[in-house]
Amino acid sequence: MSLVHEVQSALNRLPIPSHTPQTLTAEAAGQHLTLHLDGVDSLACGFVLLEFESQALASAGIEQLKQVAEKLEKRLTYLLEPISPIEHDAEHCVVQLRSNPPQRNEDRTSYYELLVSRGGRLSLARYAKQVGGVRQPVSSHVTREVLLRLIGDFAQVAS
């Protein structure tokens, strides 16, 4: 069974509606997903952090991680904002992508942050920052269909 099917099955087993934080894990074909949910209903879910790990990228160097980041930039066009690489750190072997441009209103900026890291780890979170404040993690609200597509894209790019 594919990782997407594993996640879909796990989502279908969760009680709905639920606004209780819960962690969903799934594994298939050398890929592991941990999804930190803060809400689930029949149509959508909210997650604070999506963590993905791929054995195929376990020994990847910075150049291969940059290629993964570029592929994700091209595929993840359905998020609230487009994402693009903003920084890479060869010493720590990590590529950072963010919403470009972020979502802004009068007193708040919100954006996605995607890290492609050593060991085949990818993580996606959404942050918000009030004017004059520090950034805080916030929930990413997506339909179940978009969540499964996102996981499928991570799995495809990281294989």
Regions found by a protein language model. Name each.
Residues 38-41, 89, 107, 153:
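Acidic-enriched, low-complexity/disordered segments with a strong bias for Aspartate over Glutamate
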